[in-house]
């Protein structure tokens, strides 16, 4: 029997606000345990939550970016459960009226076609703290994360393979990152994924019993965990067994999923409206104000890069993978840069440098204007491509004008024959063996001589001019 896989994803995105959702405590990552807390986070008796308006702004922005309808009368609910990292014994979330609903995004499939994935809802909530289990036998609670604002984005069960789930996450991350509401760094926990997967015989409309997967710390692990789970479920059904509704975790070491617990239903949380927060009315003017702040998204930019600038689909995808690089590219073009040349530098030397340094393009000193100026120096013959690499590293570390640095460092390319000819004669005089080899018919000796010429000029000789002059002088021998 052949089965069809059915996948839905729940993605928690940490919102990049300065303070928490219901308290004024900082919402920064990486501080000492319990440094970013106050009496609201600790749930002292009598304290009340105060809504952070910026969180609603970000919620509206996410909903619009994901083509969602917005609940203009929005309220919060209590989700009741006990755990040490949850001092109130309940989480403030949204249950029946999330801020966004009925949305969709498009994903690109492996064959180049696109597919629309529906999004059921996006709701705002507070994050829980973090438990750490020490080797000394004690468990420690860090409430820095308690109250950090989240938006949970719940897709419909529209994905039919682990590859489609991977494509959905990639597209979703790009869109969220472009809005600026989150840095979506899985390694820091600002984007977390739970996956729901079931299988059913082909042609059957009713969904099978689903399993929820957790501990999915990268998109690749999502894909691997889903691939293992669809195989596990198929083997159970083919052997006459039944799938249990349960929560399982992905084991990175073995590539398997392991049972955590039997899955709870929403009734177990005893949701009811949050009595300490009012109903929030989101007026049309508020929505339109947020809409006006939305940037052009990757799909739109890629179409422009291919259609207007003549770049390949591959180049367009690489340049729009992050908003920072895409913005840099567009600023460089606005400064007069050539699209293909700027694209080549961003995907080549710049990308290599960023990877080696572990930085983003926003964290180095290079500006779009400086890069454009440097590329112009290559185009007009002032510097060679080889020298440009040295110039780029200087600009990345120190910033400043490419032209001024080239002049100050004495890196201007030597293209004047009157300057090059005496150096060529000196190279000939110091390399008699290569000259004799050339006279004897070994034309490869010329390569050695051009190498010596470049060495003598510290790489500043114009390669094309130098090669032409050297060949002419060799013919005179």
UniProtKB/Swiss-Prot annotation:
Q: Which reaction(s) are listed as its catalytic activity?
A: L-glutamyl-tRNA(Gln) + L-glutamine + ATP + H2O = L-glutaminyl-tRNA(Gln) + L-glutamate + ADP + phosphate + H(+); L-aspartyl-tRNA(Asn) + L-glutamine + ATP + H2O = L-asparaginyl-tRNA(Asn) + L-glutamate + ADP + phosphate + 2 H(+)
Enzyme Commission numbers on file: 6.3.5.-
One Pfam match, given by its short name, reads: GatB_N
Keyword Ligase part of the UniProt annotation: yes
Signal peptide residues are: none
User: In the record, what terms sit under GO molecular function?
Assistant: asparaginyl-tRNA synthase (glutamine-hydrolyzing) activity; ATP binding; glutaminyl-tRNA synthase (glutamine-hydrolyzing) activity
| Keyword list, A-Z | ATP-binding, Ligase, Nucleotide-binding, Protein biosynthesis
Alphabetized InterPro entries for the sequence: Asn/Gln-tRNA_amidoTrfase_suB/E, Asn/Gln-tRNA_Trfase_suB/E_cat, Asn/Gln_amidotransferase, Asn/Gln_tRNA_amidoTrase-B-like, GatB, GatB_C_1, GatB_Yqey_C_2, Gln-tRNA_amidoTrfase_suB_CS
One GO biological process this protein is involved in is: glutaminyl-tRNAGln biosynthesis via transamidation
Q: What does this protein do?
A: Allows the formation of correctly charged Asn-tRNA(Asn) or Gln-tRNA(Gln) through the transamidation of misacylated Asp-tRNA(Asn) or Glu-tRNA(Gln) in organisms which lack either or both of asparaginyl-tRNA or glutaminyl-tRNA synthetases. The reaction takes place in the presence of glutamine and ATP through an activated phospho-Asp-tRNA(Asn) or phospho-Glu-tRNA(Gln).
Quote the HAMAP family the UniProt record gives.
GatB
What's the protein called, per UniProt? Answer: Aspartyl/glutamyl-tRNA(Asn/Gln) amidotransferase subunit B
Q: Supply the source organism's classification.
A: Bacteria, Bacillati, Bacillota, Bacilli, Lactobacillales
Query: Which gene does this sequence derive from?
Result: gatB
